[in-house]
C-alpha cells in the first residue's frame, strides 16, 4: 500500500510516518510545506528507508498535488497538513483559512481526479482520510457547572459542530468539505476527530513542551486563567496507531473519534510535569514555584472530552498509554533530546512566544 501523508513533518504527521515505516510494509510519500512547525529531524530515523520519500510542497498547489497522485500511484491519503495553534489563529486567521480550508479543497480535487481514473477495484479500496480535531464540537459542560449527580457529557461522532476559534472553525469547514466530496462525488472519505495530543517531537508552542522547556530554563510557566480548563490527553504514538487503523480498516463515509480517556485540568497537567522534574532533575526549589497565571485566551473552551467507544468497538483500537506513563516518557524524551529542542527554537519562534505571553501578565 502506498500512502500520501500531508503534513508528515509535523508533530502528529511525523509520528504517523514513523509508525508506518517502522511497523508495516507500506510506503509513504510525505508532502510538507515545512512551515515553522515542520521539522525533518523528527523523521531522521526513517529517512533512509526505500519505502519513504519526501516532497517539499504546499497542498494549495493544485498542479503539484495532481503530479504526486499520478507519479506515485497512491492507494490512500492521510491528510494532516494544517495550521493548528489556536492562539496563532486569533492573531493571524488568514493562514488558517488558506491552508485548512482552501488547501483541503485543492487536495480533495486532486484526489477526486486521480480516483476517477482508477479501475473499479482500486476505486473501491481507495481512501481519503481527513484528520481533524475535537475542537470542532465547541466545548462541554465543566464539572464545576453541573450537579455532582449528573453524568458528564462526551463528544460523540454525532455531536453538533459549534467551533469557537478561527482554528476550529477552519477545521470544521474542512470536515464539511470532505463529507460533501463523499456525498456529491462518491470519493471514499473518512474523517477522524482527536483529543489533545502530547509526546515526543512536539513543537514547543503547545502547553506540555512549553512547560517542560520553560521549567528547565528557569522561566515562568504561563497558565491561562485559573488553569481549570479540562482536556482529554492522547499520547501521539497511540494516535498514530489509531490513524493507521482508520485508513486501513475504517469504512468510507464514517467518522471516528479518537481519545485517550485522560481528562485533566491544565493546572494538574502542569503540576504533574513539575513533580516529575522535581524527581528527575531536582533543584533547590520546586518547579511549581515558576507557575505564573496570565490573562485567559479569548473564547477559551472550558472542557473537551472524547467518547472513543466507536473506534474501540468497530476497529479494535484502544490507547496503550495512561497519562502517567505517557507524560513520564514525554518528559524523559525532552531531557534526552536537547539537540532537537535547540534546533527548533528559532528566532521566529522566540519572538512569537514573547508576543503571545508577555502581553498577558
UniProtKB/Swiss-Prot annotation:
Give the first-level EC class, as a single word: lyase
Q: State the name under which the record lists this protein.
A: dTDP-glucose 4,6-dehydratase
Per the record, the gene is rfbB
Can you quote the record's cofactor note? Binds 1 NAD(+) per subunit.
Q: Which residues bind NAD(+)?
A: 11-12, 32-35, 58-59, 80-84, 99, 167-171, 197
Q: Which reaction does it catalyse?
A: dTDP-alpha-D-glucose = dTDP-4-dehydro-6-deoxy-alpha-D-glucose + H2O
State the InterPro entries in the record.
dTDP_Gluc_deHydtase, NAD(P)-bd_dom, NAD(P)-bd_dom_sf
User: What does this protein need as cofactor?
Assistant: NAD(+)
Question: What Gene Ontology molecular function terms does this protein carry?
Answer: dTDP-glucose 4,6-dehydratase activity
Q: What role does this protein play?
A: Catalyzes the dehydration of dTDP-D-glucose to form dTDP-6-deoxy-D-xylo-4-hexulose via a three-step process involving oxidation, dehydration and reduction.
Biological process GO terms, please?
A: dTDP-rhamnose biosynthetic process; lipopolysaccharide biosynthetic process; O antigen biosynthetic process; polysaccharide biosynthetic process
**Residue positions binding substrate:** 84, 133, 196, 206-207, 222-224, 231, 266, 296-300
The beginning of the lineage is: Bacteria, Pseudomonadati, Pseudomonadota, Gammaproteobacteria, Enterobacterales
Print the keywords alphabetically: Lipopolysaccharide biosynthesis, Lyase, NAD
Q: How does it assemble?
A: Homodimer.
Q: Which pathway does this chain act in?
A: Carbohydrate biosynthesis; dTDP-L-rhamnose biosynthesis; Bacterial outer membrane biogenesis; LPS O-antigen biosynthesis
List the SUPFAM superfamilies hit by this protein, alphabetically.
Answer: NAD(P)-binding Rossmann-fold domains
The answer to whether UniProt assigns keyword NAD to this entry is yes
| E.C. numbers | 4.2.1.46
Q: Which family does it belong to?
A: Belongs to the NAD(P)-dependent epimerase/dehydratase family. dTDP-glucose dehydratase subfamily.
Active-site residues, record numbering mapped to chain = 134-135, 167
Amino acid at each position: 500500500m502506498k500512502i500520501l501523508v500531508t503534513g508528515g513533518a509535523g508533530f502528529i504527521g511525523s509520528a504517523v510516518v514513523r509508525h508506518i515505516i517502522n511497523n508495516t510494509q507500506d510506503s509513504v510519500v510525505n508532502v510538507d510545506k515545512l512551515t515553522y512547525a515542520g521539522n525533518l529531524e523528527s523523521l531522521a530515523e526513517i529517512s533512509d528507508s526505500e519505502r519513504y520519500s519526501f516532497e517539499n510542497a504546499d497542498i494549495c498547489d493544485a498542479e503539484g498535488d495532481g503530479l504526486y497522485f499520478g507519479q506515485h500511484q497512491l492507494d490512500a491519503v492521510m491528510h494532516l497538513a494544517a495550521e493548528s495553534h489556536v492562539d496563532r489563529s486569533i492573531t493571524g486567521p488568514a493562514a488558517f483559512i488558506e491552508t485548512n480550508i482552501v488547501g483541503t479543497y485543492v487536495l480533495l480535487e486532486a484526489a477526486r481526479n486521480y480516483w476517477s481514473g482508477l479501475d473499479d477495484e482500486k476505486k473501491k479500496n481507495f481512501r481519503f482520510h481527513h484528520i481533524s480535531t475535537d475542537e470542532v464540537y465547541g466545548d462541554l459542560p465543566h464539572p464545576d457547572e453541573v450537579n455532582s449527580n449528573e453524568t458528564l457529557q462526551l463528544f460523540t461522532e454525532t455531536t453538533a459542530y459549534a467551533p469557537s476559534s478561527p482554528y476550529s472553525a477552519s477545521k470544521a469547514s474542512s470536515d464539511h468539505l470532505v463529507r460533501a466530496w463523499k456525498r456529491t462525488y462518491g470519493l471514499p472519505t473518512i474523517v477522524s476527530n482527536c483529543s489533545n495530543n502530547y509526546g515526543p517531537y512536539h513543537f514547543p508552542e503547545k502547553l506540555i513542551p512549553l512547560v517542560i522547556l520553560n521549567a528547565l530554563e528557569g522561566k515562568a510557566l504561563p497558565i491561562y486563567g485559573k488553569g481549570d480548563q479540562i482536556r482529554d490527553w492522547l499520547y501521539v504514538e497511540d494516535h498514530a496507531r489509531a490513524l493507521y487503523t482508520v485508513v486501513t480498516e475504517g469504512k468510507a463515509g464514517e467518522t471516528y473519534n479518537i481519545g485517550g480517556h485522560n481528562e485533566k485540568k491544565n493546572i494538574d497537567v502542569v503540576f504533574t510535569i513539575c513533580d516529575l522534574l522535581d524527581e528527575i532533575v531536582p533543584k533547590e526549589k520546586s518547579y511549581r514555584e515558576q507557575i505564573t497565571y496570565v490573562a485567559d485566551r479569548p473564547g477559551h473552551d472550558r472542557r473537551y472530552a472524547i467518547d472513543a467507544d466507536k473506534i474501540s468497538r468497530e476497529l479494535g483500537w484502544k490507547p496503550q498509554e495512561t497519562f502517567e506513563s505517557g507524560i513520564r516518557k514525554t518528559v524523559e524524551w525532552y531531557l534526552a533530546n536537547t539537540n532537537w529542542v535547540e534546533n527548533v527554537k528559532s528566532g521566529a519562534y522566540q519572538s512569537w512566544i514573547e508576543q503571545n505571553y508577555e502581553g498577558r501578565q
